[in-house]
């Protein structure tokens, strides 16, 4: 595994949950403000 492949794998493993958390928080915040 090259350094670039390691960096890409690490980025995807790190970025995917963070992005999902931000999207979830945004939807929950919007839903609560809507009620």
Curated annotation (Swiss-Prot):
Induction, per UniProt: Expression of the proteinaceous toxin is probably controlled by an antisense sRNA, in this case rdlB. Only a few of these TA systems have been mechanistically characterized; the mechanisms used to control expression of the toxin gene are not necessarily the same.
Coiled coil: none
GO cellular component: plasma membrane
Tagged with keyword Flavoprotein: no
Major location (coarse): membrane
Transmembrane segments: 10-30
Subcellular location: Cell inner membrane
Topology of this chain in the membrane: Single-pass membrane protein
The organism's place on the tree of life at top rank: Bacteria
Keywords carried by this UniProt record: Cell inner membrane, Cell membrane, Membrane, Toxin-antitoxin system, Transmembrane, Transmembrane helix
Record family assignment: Belongs to the Ldr toxic peptide family.
Function: Toxic component of a type I toxin-antitoxin (TA) system. Overexpression causes rapid cell killing, probably by disrupting the cell inner membrane and disruption of ATP synthesis.
Protein name: Small toxic polypeptide LdrB
Species in which this protein is naturally found: Escherichia coli (strain K12)
